[in-house]
Amino acid sequence: MLNRRRVVQGGLAAAGSLTVSAPFRARAQGKPPVKIRYSEVVRAILYAPAYAAITNGYFKDAGLDVSLTTAQGGDKAVAALLSNSADIALIGPESAIYVQNSESPTKTPIFCGLTATDGFMLMSRDKIDKFEWSMLKGKDILGFRPGSTPILFFEAAMRQNGIDPLKDVKLNNNIAIPARVGSWLAGQNQFAIFIEPDASQLELDGKAHFLASIGETVGPADYTTFMATDKYIKDNPAVIQAWTDAIYKAQKWTASQPAADVAKAIEPFFQGVNPKALAAAAERYRKLNIWKDTPKIEPKAMERFQDILVQGNVLDNAKRVKFETLVLTEFANKAK
């Protein structure tokens, strides 16, 4: 969710070719674990496999000592990378795209995928037995910050279903993230998009009803990815491989375990959230194939992502970034 005009400039230039070293075996060799400063864009169940990698000890087993911080914004997370206050960040691909197009000498290539598409749900105030997208016409809808990926993906979903988001609906995009649920409960808007666990909790409370998955509607377009500076990756390829291996293990575990077990694994990161909402959210994301089961990122998914940015007028078509520039595929290809 990064505005390209706010990309932080700076960092060190990196040169030379990337060479992937042998798998990282710090623990096996008795070496102290490598400390990783990890920044996630926001706290969300959408990133459950990453939390599972921590609670299940996959990072630890890979010889990584992970320190997690929540940036509260893609611009802040990528700024942490560029200022060398974070080593690895979980952000949307738009961050890497905007940095690539900026004057910053340091770039932030993607090396591992986590989510296959958008994780927001379209919800209604009243129960609708047979939803049709045309029902949104003329209605007030609680959206998201202008230019952010949640609203861009929602607009793309509407366009796919014959709705002009600029003319056919009234999008209320000026509600701050912490105030969105409260605004809905106060009776504002007839429809809304919510991420988990808010969507499931509102359903459990009878305050909203599920209509459609934005991500399922839009299709594969890797929504959140791991990235680091080109210099960090060049200097620490074994660490990047170890990270990718740990995420792959977590992806396979998340895909195979009961929703209740996934909810239990991520519960420490969602203090105070109803366990039933966590389990319902986990089951929904898995059913909708929102979580990737591999760290590999496909060119078509990145093309689709950039299509959405172009349609939303936050990326000039002439400034699309080539897949081979945007994504380093060698780490995901070797993940085990």
Model-inferred region functions:
Residues 1-15:
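N-terminal secretory signal peptides and thylakoid transit peptides that target proteins
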Residues 19:
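Aromatic-lined ligand-binding clefts that engage carbohydrates, nucleic acids, or primary amines
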Residues 24-27:
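Sec/Tat signal peptide C-region and signal peptidase I cleavage site
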Residues 29-166, 170-174, 180-183, 190-196, ...:
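Short, glycine-/small- and polar/acidic-enriched structural segments
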Residues 51, 97, 155, 200, ...:
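Predominant activation on well-ordered alpha-helical scaffold segments within soluble catalytic domains
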Residues 95, 178-270:
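Pocket-lining segment of extracytoplasmic ligand-binding domains
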Residues 234-316:
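Secondary-structure end/capping motifs
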Residues 306-336:
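Conserved C-terminal helix/tail region of periplasmic/extracytoplasmic solute-binding proteins
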